[in-house]
């Protein structure tokens, strides 16, 4: 069976991994079954209704992930693209870290840090991001006393990964190419 899996396209393997993870969660927590509906879209979702950027702004996204992430339309477009590839966990982690930095209450910060860790960092997390062991260790140490910078090292690694891998795929995608025509 494993030899057969190797022959499948990468997107099929990613989808299978996502289904396996969600089924595992479902078996552990049947009361949350409604949250685990697995949508399958042939085409990416349209971005949320925001002001469409100019062509010049959109062209800047090719060279700057930060400019893309700072633009609501660009962020929504990028997120839709990543969802269509079943690879949105890195962006979701980055966004969760941005929201986390804004928390003022130490109690809320500790609760949110635990949720982010359990959802994205720990081994076999539902949306585990691809970071090295050293970065995980630093993050775990930072979470002993949660602060706004607890996830900074991991967030920077994920940002670099998105810049190197996800952004070029987005720029080459039909989704972006149609947008800049």
Swiss-Prot record:
Asked whether the keyword Membrane is assigned, the reply is yes
Which residue range or ranges hold the RGS domain? 64-180
The subcellular localization recorded is: Cytoplasm; Membrane
Q: What is this protein called?
A: Regulator of G-protein signaling 5
Could you give one GO CC term from the UniProt record? Answer: cytosol
Q: Which organism is it from?
A: Bos taurus (Bovine)
**Pfam families from the xrefs?**
RGS
* Gene3D superfamilies referenced in this protein's UniProt entry, alphabetically: 1.10.196.10, Regulator of G-protein Signalling 4, domain 2
UniProt keyword Cytoplasm, yes or no:
yes
Give the UniProt keywords, A-Z: Cytoplasm, Membrane, Signal transduction inhibitor
